[in-house]
Amino acid sequence: MGSVDASEKTITGWAARDATGHLSPYTYNLRRTGAEDVVLKVLYCGICHTDLHQTKNHLGASKYPMVPGHEVVGEVVEVGPEVSKYSVGDVVGVGVIVGCCRDCRPCKANVEQYCNKKIWSYNDVYTDGKPTQGGFAGSMVVDQKFVVKIPAGLAPEQAAPLLCAGVTVYSPLKHFGLMTPGLRGGILGLGGVGHMGVKVAKSMGHHVTVISSSDKKRAEAMDDLGADDYLVSSDEAQMAAAMDSLDYIIDTVPVKHPLEPYLALLKMDGKLVLMGVIGEPLSFVSPMVMLGRKTITGSFIGSIEETEEVLRFCVDKGLTSQIEVVKMDYLNQALERLERNDVRYRFVVDVAGSNIDDTAA
């Protein structure tokens, strides 16, 4: 174990204080280091669309002050006496959840992200009764079960988006048996998750169609990301010509939208996989699924096991996420740009390089 007791350490993070979502420096104490805990110095943290939802209370359950960030890469600086998986100096990652009951069916099946008692990386309450705070901060304390090793060959800033966006697209492709080469897949929405969907699906040997509401992303989808086709959803002729052509659609859109136009694109037995966090009901008429034995389903991030898999997959395939690295003092501007879809394709905050302790008020 390292010589610093994390329970005595006061750190600085950037927190939202209310539903305006504005972040500013905030000091707080790390929780006491448990026997199986890992203390990490945060190096980088990705910015996810969920951070917008949470900081602005779009889902109605936000608690303040809130330090967001759940795509966290850091260096281990201390370990509890029963930690066996990690050592001081390891570069590791932490994703969306930091706790679960370990006793329910999902936990026993190693899909702990579906545990009804899971503990979120931030905006939640830990087992000690204290609020969890995320990766827009100097340090974190996390149970070793919810920590993954960043493999050699993957830069830490590149690894950050894979801990949420990367595993979010990998998990349903694996679970629903959609990893077979030659499948025809659609990626609806070309943001942080969608761009990884294109890359992962292409690396599995799929024919990939990007679906977007306008033609403005065609060049980046096909020339930069390597998509095979581009479909403008507002063009009725294009949509009609593409009916019954796709084995699956990964729907990453995080706002309310119609489902029926996309169900029509699926072949018989095709799957529409919902991934966007949407706080309003979505609707469709039942014949749209009945007459093709189609499935509307959902998938939520991925397990710790799948996170480790997608990190190795990206190293093996030479995949990287397309990121814009920013400093901590750019956080609010980055969130504003994310809200208006002005990023290609993921912001990653250089936490360690931001000297955040100097900004504490």
From Swiss-Prot:
Keywords: Lignin biosynthesis, Metal-binding, NADP, Oxidoreductase, Zinc. Pfam families: ADH_N, ADH_zinc_N. GO terms for molecular function: cinnamyl-alcohol dehydrogenase activity; coniferyl-alcohol dehydrogenase activity; zinc ion binding. InterPro entries: ADH-like_C (IPR013149), ADH-like_N (IPR013154), ADH_Zn_CS (IPR002328), CAD-like (IPR047109), GroES-like_sf (IPR011032), NAD(P)-bd_dom_sf (IPR036291), PKS_ER (IPR020843). Zn(2+) 1 binds at residues 48, 70-71, 164. NADP(+) binds at residues 50, 168, 189-194, 212-217, 252, 276, 299-301. Its cofactor is Zn(2+). Zn(2+) 2 binds at residues 101, 104, 107, 115. Pathway: Aromatic compound metabolism; phenylpropanoid biosynthesis. The keyword Phosphoprotein does not apply. SUPFAM superfamilies: GroES-like, NAD(P)-binding Rossmann-fold domains. The keyword NADP applies. Binds 2 Zn(2+) ions per subunit. It catalyses: (E)-cinnamyl alcohol + NADP(+) = (E)-cinnamaldehyde + NADPH + H(+); (E)-coniferol + NADP(+) = (E)-coniferaldehyde + NADPH + H(+); (E)-sinapyl alcohol + NADP(+) = (E)-sinapaldehyde + NADPH + H(+); (E)-4-coumaroyl alcohol + NADP(+) = (E)-4-coumaraldehyde + NADPH + H(+). One of its GO terms (biological process) is lignin biosynthetic process. Its EC number is 1.1.1.195. It is an enzyme of class 1 (oxidoreductase). Involved in lignin biosynthesis. Catalyzes the final step specific for the production of lignin monomers. Catalyzes the NADPH-dependent reduction of coniferaldehyde, 5-hydroxyconiferaldehyde, sinapaldehyde, 4-coumaraldehyde and caffeyl aldehyde to their respective alcohols. Homodimer. Belongs to the zinc-containing alcohol dehydrogenase family. This is Probable cinnamyl alcohol dehydrogenase.
